[in-house]
Each structure stands twice: as C-alpha cells, then as structure tokens.
Amino acid sequence: MPADDYPVTELTKALIARPSVTPLDEGCQTLMAERLSAIGFNIEPMVFEDTTNMWARRGNEGPVFCFAGHTDVVPTGDVSRWHTPPFVPTIIDGYLYGRGAADMKGSLAAMVIATECFVAKHPDHNGSIAFLITSDEEGPFINGTTRVIDTLEARNEKITWALVGEPSSTLKLGDVVKNGRRGSLTGNLTVKGIQGHVAYPHLADNPIHKAAPFLAELSQMHWDNGNEFFPPTSFQIANINGGTGASNVIPGALDVMFNFRYSTEVTADILIERVEALLKAHELDYDISWIFNGLPFLTGDGPLLDATRIAIRQVTGYETDPQTTGGTSDGRFIAPTGAKVLELGPVNATIHKVNECVKVDDLEQLALCYEVILEQLLC
C-alpha cells in the first residue's frame, strides 16, 4: 500500500484539516469518537467552559491503559511563510505538512488506528482501553486534562498506565521516549518603588535599581545537582517590565516573571522559601505570587516502559532512550493519581514552527508501536 494511502495517514489528514487552534476542537474529537464508538467504546464528552474534552473507554475491568493527547494546536504564525496552507494537509517528498502534523494529530490518528487493529485481533482483551483527549493542552490548561482527571478521581476511576502522544522523538521515530518530566514553578514578582522625575532621584525610589542586585544574585544561585534521572534545576527570567516608556520618568514598579524547571532533588516549597529569603535579605518592598504548573514525575522500569522498549525494538529495530528533559505535558496531571506515564510520539524538529511536518512512514510505524504496546500490556 502506498504510504499516502495508509489508514493512519488518511485520519491524520482529516484531523489536520480541522483548524483547531486552542482551545477549539473543531470536530476532531467527534471524528475520533465515531471511530472508537464503532469498536465498542463508551464515549463521554466533558465540556468545561471553552474547552472540549473526551473520555472514551472500552471495558469495565482493570488494568486501564489510557491513550492521552490533545486536539488543539498552536497558531500558524505568518501563513505566507508556509510552503502550503497550514490547514490543507499536503504530502511532499514523503512528509505530511500541516499545523498539528507532529503535535499531535499524527499521534491521535496512530492511537485510533492501533486500537482498531488491536481490538479486531483481540476482541476479548484483558482490562480496559481508554482515551483522554482535550482541546486545552496548548492553552492555559485550566479546563482540560486536569478537569477530566478531577472527574475521574471523584468517582474513583483509576488509570493504570497512560501513554501520551507528545512528539518525544528527536532524530528518528522512537529514539527517545519521555519517562518523566521536571516540575514547573512560575513566580510573578512586583518590586515597588516611588515614581518621579529622573532629574530629581532623591524624590523618587527606582525599583529597577533596587531589584538589579537581587536579580543578579538570584540568576546565579545553585539550586541542586540533579540526579541520575533529572538534570539540575534551572532558573530563567522570562519577562521584565518597568517604566512608562518615557526617558524622563523613574518607574514606580518593576514586574518580573520567572520560571523554575526543577528536579526531584528539591520541592516547590524549598524554591519559594529560598527566593523569598533572598528578597528579604535585599530589603525589597515587593508582592509575589506563585503558579504551580506541575510536579516532577518519573516512570521507572516496569510494565509500561518494558512494553514500550519492546515495541520500539520490534518495529524500528533499535533501542530507545528514556529521558526526562524538555517541557511539560499533560502527563503531569495524570501522574499524581498514581498512574505510570510515558510519552511516545513523532520527531519534534518542526513542532510549533512554520511548515510543521511529519514523515508519513513514521506515522505507520508509530501506529504499529502503539499496537504492540497494547498487546504487551493487555494480552
């Protein structure tokens, strides 16, 4: 069968054609639900405010294997810089182009195709298969996976293993899987001063001057050494805003946004304590608020990682490398329930970029990997 005609390719194209810029779903979940319903899944839409979610399940017993993913995509950017229209899926030289091709409509299609093939071969499989799909992963992540998990937890419905379809691969399909993620903590700091004329500094109090030594020291602090699973905790200033835009006005306040990506060697509470102690040491007048974006998690050796290793080896012929580097995913909302979480998806070289694309043959291989994982865990 030509690669252009793979079932996974056709479904990926159908999903890309729906311009589901976050938090829109644009019918993607309905398309998936129709396919899953036809093979015995119970479909439960969960709509929270502007976000469309879907919980689909086949089976009533444990263990529960869950495919997790998102139908929303990031904005296209300058459309004139795309080789082809971003929501007109187009195959060129063996690559499928379109917004969401790699992140993550290709993975969603591979999940559905793998499940259809698995159920056809194993209609009486062990346990249950589930899909947790949201349209809020690329946005503020308020009404998406976290709300679905809250609903499941309230009725004591547990996930045993979760496979998130985020584009984990770097150079070739399956060379890297993510078996954990660092925690993420954001600080929003306002350093207060007194606004005034730059010619009369004795009548004002410049918050930028006051904050500069603090920020310099904060940016050079050593937080931890990491461990065998996680790199050392990192700190980055993301935004600094102060002033009126005029050259003759001392600002009355300085706003700073910063972020920690932290290992299991520290906790959010420890980071907060150290930052606020430094603020006090510099005798700053300030307000600060904190946003907890997710706890660090790790899935070590066990059935899920073993099954994934076997699948990638069987389909691609090489060994995978479990890593915890990179950004956050919705896996951070699933892991605290006790589920084992892993991420496996396409090559991530073009995600969020102009001319996002995925290798068509990789989609077929990804579907095969997902199917083997199901066989390893539920047969």
UniProtKB/Swiss-Prot annotation:
Q: Which domain of life is it from?
A: Bacteria
| Cofactor dependence | Zn(2+); Co(2+)
Q: Sorted alphabetically, which keywords does the UniProt record give?
A: Amino-acid biosynthesis, Cobalt, Diaminopimelate biosynthesis, Hydrolase, Lysine biosynthesis, Metal-binding, Zinc
Q: Which gene encodes it?
A: dapE
Tell me which CDD domains the record gives: M20_DapE_proteobac
InterPro entries this protein is in? Answer: ArgE/DapE_CS, Bact_exopeptidase_dim_dom, DapE_proteobac, Peptidase_M20, Peptidase_M20_dimer, Peptidase_M20A
Question: Per its UniProt record, what Pfam families does this chain match?
Answer: M20_dimer (PF07687), Peptidase_M20 (PF01546)
Q: Which reaction does it catalyse?
A: N-succinyl-(2S,6S)-2,6-diaminopimelate + H2O = (2S,6S)-2,6-diaminopimelate + succinate
Cofactor binding note from Swiss-Prot or TrEMBL: Binds 2 Zn(2+) or Co(2+) ions per subunit.
| Alphabetized PANTHER family for the sequence | ACETYLORNITHINE DEACETYLASE, N-ACETYL-L-CITRULLINE DEACETYLASE
Protein EC: 3.5.1.18
Q: What is this protein called?
A: Succinyl-diaminopimelate desuccinylase
Give residues annotated as binding Zn(2+) 2. 103, 138, 352
Residues bound to Zn(2+) 1 are 70, 103, 166
The UniProt similarity line reads:
Belongs to the peptidase M20A family. DapE subfamily.
Annotated active site residues, numbered on this chain, are 72, 137 (proton acceptor)
